[in-house]
């Protein structure tokens, strides 16, 4: 049987095209993930710079000013310094738990960004259970902190890990109940649907006005989940040296440093999505498409405006947790647990009951 050379060349060209399609398909799948990771990294750098500048202003001192223009590259310089430091491991600790703990904390928070809409349907995964996916994933992070504390074989580290687990359990329940109230109000658990439900009524349709009690409980619970003052008991310097971070150095310590700011950013983004209308500007009697002529200029410009509005709301809200760091004193452990179980939990349950009743009456 004789096969023509042209047929062989045609078959080879088809196989090359198929392989190129597979490569391009993989690149196209990874491109949104890479873009999201790059955006999150830049966002964390901006948060660190903002916190240092605001903290310097509150304390009436000069903030970072040498690393880059206005000191904006200070966080990058700190990260480079941590990368170059020696990575020490306790000789008497559990090496596996000690090494895995920081990675679990960072990865679980990173996954939360996959359900955050930064613009009109600009979301990595528009899940029907988006907000509860975030709550489920974020509950894994304290497991990593507990593993880090136990694997360090240090009493201060272990106590810090236990505190992190107890604090997370205490405040995740009120947080979840507030999110459930929002889901009932929006008739959906998708983050995109929640934003669109708020956009129907303009500025006064934000869940900030429709759920004021839930917003306050959500704000306090998210601060506790981020372990920000006055809820930073797992790493209280005066009591536990550095808590579960005591034995860490180098890149592993840097992962905890990144995780804290990632958690702060994701909490602020969810406040924007759940309570502040997301990517909708919602100025009374003025809508973003008519204001900027988005319908005339195409979807790309509208998407960019949506991203800008979302990030602007997020960074404006970030002033609250940064200001509370230098305003409020740290709570005791018994005060923290009492606040979560005796006050926030009953209030969030009452808010859920009121929301359910109002939804039934509106039918």
UniProtKB/Swiss-Prot annotation:
Membrane topology designation: Multi-pass membrane protein
Key word Plastid present: yes
Location of this chain's protein in the cell: Plastid, Chloroplast thylakoid membrane
Top EC group: translocase
Protein role: NDH shuttles electrons from NAD(P)H:plastoquinone, via FMN and iron-sulfur (Fe-S) centers, to quinones in the photosynthetic chain and possibly in a chloroplast respiratory chain. The immediate electron acceptor for the enzyme in this species is believed to be plastoquinone. Couples the redox reaction to proton translocation, and thus conserves the redox energy in a proton gradient.
Stored PANTHER family: NADH DEHYDROGENASE SUBUNIT 1, NADH-UBIQUINONE OXIDOREDUCTASE CHAIN 1
Family to which the UniProt record says this protein belongs: Belongs to the complex I subunit 1 family.
The name this protein goes by in its record: NAD(P)H-quinone oxidoreductase subunit 1, chloroplastic
Native organism: Nicotiana tomentosiformis
């Amino acid at each position: 049987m004789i096969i023509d050379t042209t047929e062989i060349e045609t078959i080879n060209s088809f196989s090359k095209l198929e392989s190129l399609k597979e490569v391009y398909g993989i690149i196209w799948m990874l491109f949104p993930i890479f873009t999201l990771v790059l955006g999150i990294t830049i966002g964390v750098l901006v948060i660190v710079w903002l916190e240092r500048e605001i903290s310097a202003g509150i304390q009436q001192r000069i903030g970072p000013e040498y690393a880059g223009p206005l000191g904006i590259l200070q966080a990058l310089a700190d990260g480079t310094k941590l990368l170059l430091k020696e990575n020490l491991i306790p000789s008497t600790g559990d090496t596996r738990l000690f090494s895995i703990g920081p990675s679990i904390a960072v990865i679980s928070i990173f996954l939360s960004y996959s359900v955050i809409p930064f613009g009109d349907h600009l979301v990595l995964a528009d899940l029907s259970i988006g907000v509860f996916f975030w709550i489920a994933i974020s509950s894994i992070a304290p497991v990593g902190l507990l593993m880090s504390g136990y694997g360090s074989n240090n009493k201060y580290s272990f106590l810090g890990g236990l505190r992190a687990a107890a604090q997370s359990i205490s405040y995740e329940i009120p947080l979840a109940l507030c999110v459930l109230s929002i889901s009932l109000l929006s008739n959906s658990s998708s983050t995109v649907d929640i934003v669109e439900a708020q956009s129907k009524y303009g500025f006064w349709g934000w869940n900030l006005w429709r759920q004021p009690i839930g917003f306050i409980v959500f704000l306090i619970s998210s601060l506790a989940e981020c372990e920000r003052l006055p809820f930073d008991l797992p790493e209280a310097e005066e009591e536990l040296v550095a808590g579960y971070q005591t034995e860490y150095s180098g890149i592993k310590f840097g992962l905890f440093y990144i995780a804290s700011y990632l958690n702060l950013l994701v909490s602020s983004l969810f406040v924007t999505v759940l309570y502040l209308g997301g990517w909708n500007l919602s100025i009374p009697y003025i809508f973003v498409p008519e204001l900027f002529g988005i319908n005339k200029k195409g979807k790309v410009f509208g998407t960019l405006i949506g991203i800008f509005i979302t990030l602007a709301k997020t960074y404006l809200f970030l002033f609250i947790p940064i200001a509370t760091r230098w305003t409020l004193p740290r709570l005791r452990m018994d005060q923290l647990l009492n606040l979560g179980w005796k006050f926030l939990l009953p209030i969030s349950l009452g808010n859920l009951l009121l929301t359910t009743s109002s939804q039934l009456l509106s039918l």
